[in-house]
């Protein structure tokens, strides 16, 4: 174990000397996909609860599609499937984008987490007390102002416990990135195992890294919940 750490601690944490690897790469994939997925999911969640079918149904189809298929397959489609289409390779911009493994991986991860986050936020919007909305309307708020100042802030706070689970699941899901040759923590562990044949130690180090990051994320979300969801607790 000590010899393995002495040789591979840098690749496991941040770099192999030439590229970003290991934990740094995993955190980059997680952050990029979560930020994109979060931003896109806000308007999609509003559309998801729309009373207009032509607005609601396309979003519903998208969320069912990406929640109903494995992320591994979604990554393979983005990484190899789309680039195999001649029309994609014929367009310089699309050709450059889908030739890059990082672009394909972030795209697949972002689309996947966006689908789950959209449903989380949509559920929080539906669960809002009707009285809150009526009170806001009584103050003259309507349309986008009603969503911007009342509905979405309340929905985002209430959905925090569920969104924290999605973040943790997304962290664990980044392990499929090695499929696209992305040097994340699992890819470094596989390379270390191939070079040293120390299977238990190689993957054990990877497991410890994921466990530590998970504990940190859980702690941060618990702090956020105590701060932003205090109004839901019992009155003293």
Sequence positions of predicted segments:
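Transmembrane alpha-helices and adjacent helix-loop boundaries
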Residues: 1-236
